[in-house]
């Protein structure tokens, strides 16, 4: 079952440089930044605004450019909005906490290690959360979520609503509570998945599973 040594979000207690009430656009405007807090900042179309960064906090920010957070370590994202253009926003990163945030962009997370999502709405969750491990979700809603959580590992989910097919395929060590999952072809090729107090609605569930 769940790995007792799992590591979700671990805050970094360092003094941070503050950036407030401004905007950026273009290619990599904040590349390789460290110990940074953004408040009321807009990232306009461009690419990789905060690539290769660490210990970043973003509060009440809006993201419109693609790939804003790639190869990051230590992210706190709170009360933010990711527009459709901010596709594939957080990839190849570790140690993320996101709360009270709306995501309108597809393919949001990929190859993550250690992430906590609290009160998050994903309106276009297509191909989201692939190859993510050590994840905790609390009160998360995902729509248009085809292929959500492909190859996920060590996941603890409570208070979850999903509309999307082919979810949780090839997942391992997953606990789900208080969920409403509308998904055909879900839980294929999974191992050690436990679902409590939930509704799972869809055809062809759980083919070729290990322990469940």
Locate each region found by the language model.
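Short glycine/acidic-rich loop motifs that flank beta-strands on beta-rich extracellular proteins
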Residues: 26-31, 46-51, 65-73, 85-92, ...
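Conserved small/polar residues in nucleotide/adenosyl-binding loops
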Residues: 212
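N-terminal segments that cap or nucleate solenoid repeat domains
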Residues: 2-63
């Amino acid at each position: 079952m769940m790995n007792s040594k799992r590591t979700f979000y671990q805050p970094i207690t360092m003094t941070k440089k503050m950036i407030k009430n401004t905007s950026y656009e273009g290619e990599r405007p904040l590349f390789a930044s460290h110990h940074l807090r953004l408040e009321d900042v807009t990232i306009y179309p461009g690419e990789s605004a905060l690539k290769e960064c660490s210990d970043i906090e973003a509060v009440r920010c809006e993201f419109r450019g693609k790939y804003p957070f790639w190869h990051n370590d230590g992210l706190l994202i709170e009360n933010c909005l990711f527009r459709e253009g901010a596709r594939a926003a957080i990839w190849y990163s570790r140690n993320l906490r996101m709360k009270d945030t709306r995501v309108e962009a597809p393919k949001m997370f990929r190859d993550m290690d250690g992430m906590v999502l609290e009160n998050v709405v994903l309106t276009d969750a297509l191909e989201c959360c692939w190859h993510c491990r050590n994840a905790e979700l609390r009160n998360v809603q995902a729509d248009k979520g085809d292929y959500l959580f492909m190859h996920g590992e060590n996941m603890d989910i409570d208070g979850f609503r999903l509309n999307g097919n082919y979810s949780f395929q090839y997942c391992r060590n997953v606990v789900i509570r208080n969920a409403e999952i509308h998904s055909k072809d879900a839980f294929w090729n999974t191992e050690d998945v436990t679902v409590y107090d939930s509704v799972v609605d869809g055809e062809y569930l759980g083919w070729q599973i290990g322990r469940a």
